[in-house]
């Protein structure tokens, strides 16, 4: 079974149940959530996440596995502000606890961190230090380091940087990788014409068995732009054909594929989620040039 879904919202009183209902309405077989707002660390207690009802709904609809994404504000790569580093460490520990409580997520996607001017090597050493403070041999969930576009002072912009982080971490069996198509393209990898070659390079440097999550996004920018701006499937510089090939790649069939493409519409207050129609289009193998108008009309 193709594991494909999108980022969905876990909010209100229904929490996990709301997320599962939204995912099912898109025809998804997996989904990704933030356990609270991605831009802050305010979180509801575990008992208010409505886990039991959410899991029951998932089971009834054949969803076995979901992904958690850590908030953007975590930066364990920060060498200049000890309080930012410490917040990242403490919050990651909490996220591991919350994700374990969900019982249906095995991966927490994490942007590795930004070196904020200290240089990539210093940032990577700080990320290693942070992960060594967080990871334990007993934990049942992995931290999935996301491949980054190389915007600003981001670490993890190359497979070598990801491998360096993994190699420095003591309990690195608890580390995996989230391969983001937009980020990897923006970082300079030719996933359009030679995805198999890129995957082979990833396997040599990091190990393909570490690739446990895929973020499926088109890109508004040319390859190597280092920008990180997601585009709807088939309307960017990666294109439908390449993304369809990645989604159905025989070596990655077991990997959950998560869409983080932009909502569609001119009116900021009335944008529509593209996921139902994009998932359908990636399943059926035919690019629909009129899909954006259909999304707006939903």
Swiss-Prot record:
Keywords: DNA damage, DNA repair, Endonuclease, Hydrolase, Metal-binding, Nuclease, Zinc. Zn(2+) 2 binds at residues 146, 180, 215, 260. GO terms for molecular function: deoxyribonuclease IV (phage-T4-induced) activity; DNA binding; DNA-(apurinic or apyrimidinic site) endonuclease activity; phosphoric diester hydrolase activity; zinc ion binding. Its cofactor is Zn(2+). Zn(2+) 1 binds at residues 69, 111, 146. InterPro entries: AP_endonuc_2 (IPR001719), AP_endonuc_F2_Zn_BS (IPR018246), Xyl_isomerase-like_sf (IPR036237), Xyl_isomerase-like_TIM-brl (IPR013022). This is Probable endonuclease 4. Zn(2+) 3 binds at residues 183, 228, 230. It comes from the Bacteria. It catalyses: Endonucleolytic cleavage to 5'-phosphooligonucleotide end-products. The gene is nfo. The keyword Metal-binding applies.
